[in-house]
Amino acid sequence: MQLVTAAEMQTIDNYTVETIGMPQDVLIERAAMSVIDVIGAGHFNLDHILVLAGLGNNGADGVAISRLLYAQGFNVSLQFVGNVTRAKDSVKRQLDIIEKYGLVRAEKSDFNEATLIIDAIFGTGLNNLLPEGLQKMIKAANHIEKTVIAVDTPTGIDATTGEVRGAALKAHTTVTFGYNKIGLTQRVGGYLSGNVIVKDIGLLTPQDFNFSLPDKENSPSVATS
């Protein structure tokens, strides 16, 4: 299986959107649907699903996931981590949609009430320490040992090195897109990512793209679809 760095994944994403012309919102919808597929195929307690969303494209994935779950009749809470007014346009577009669905954002959520947490705070773009307040929240969530599905990359994990950027939310399952990330296979990142599932959401790679690592045999701990 081909592994990529965070920078390589960003290049592939940019190529798909800017050169090929694939709308970002289409990729977000496909990413969200792939997570819904994993939720439906797994044995998760879906009594109360808490979606934690950040301010970037990973957060936009989270908003779309919450909408799809809500439309299917699940008890879902959507909580933003950060000031929504500073969110990317992709997030704001998703917010406009969920408002029309009638899904109201939660100002604050109790982790103890959640039976499943969807981690859509930070994806592969994380390259600095998490803010102190977010580190505290993550440590509290880890302490109560809730089942977590991470979207693309567990929050706090460097997608290239596998290092923890201050604190990291421990995932039962990580649904990552396009290619598996090096950081999800190395160091503590491999442990905190849990079961990694690679989903094809339509990202296109340039024919002359030079990967930093050679293609490897598929690992038994990684599923692809």
Swiss-Prot record:
Gene3D superfamilies for the chain: YjeF N-terminal domain (3.40.50.10260)
Species per Swiss-Prot/TrEMBL record: Leuconostoc kimchii (strain IMSNU 11154 / KCTC 2386 / IH25)
UniProt record, GO biological process: deadenylation-independent decapping of nuclear-transcribed mRNA; P-body assembly
Source superkingdom: Bacteria
UniProt cofactor(s): K(+)
Cofactor detail note: Binds 1 potassium ion per subunit.
PANTHER family in the record: ENHANCER OF MRNA-DECAPPING PROTEIN 3
Family: Belongs to the NnrE/AIBP family.
Catalysed reactions listed for this entry: (6R)-NADHX = (6S)-NADHX; (6R)-NADPHX = (6S)-NADPHX
Cited PROSITE patterns: YJEF_N
The protein's enzyme class: isomerase
The protein's Enzyme Commission number: 5.1.99.6
Chain sites annotated for binding K(+): 58, 119, 155
Any Pfam family the entry gives: YjeF_N
Listed GO MF terms: metal ion binding; mRNA binding; NAD(P)HX epimerase activity; nucleotide binding
Organism ancestry: Bacteria, Bacillati, Bacillota, Bacilli, Lactobacillales
Protein name according to UniProt: NAD(P)H-hydrate epimerase
Positions of the YjeF N-terminal domain: 9-209
Positions contributing to (6S)-NADPHX binding: 57-61, 123-129, 152
Its job: Catalyzes the epimerization of the S- and R-forms of NAD(P)HX, a damaged form of NAD(P)H that is a result of enzymatic or heat-dependent hydration. This is a prerequisite for the S-specific NAD(P)H-hydrate dehydratase to allow the repair of both epimers of NAD(P)HX.
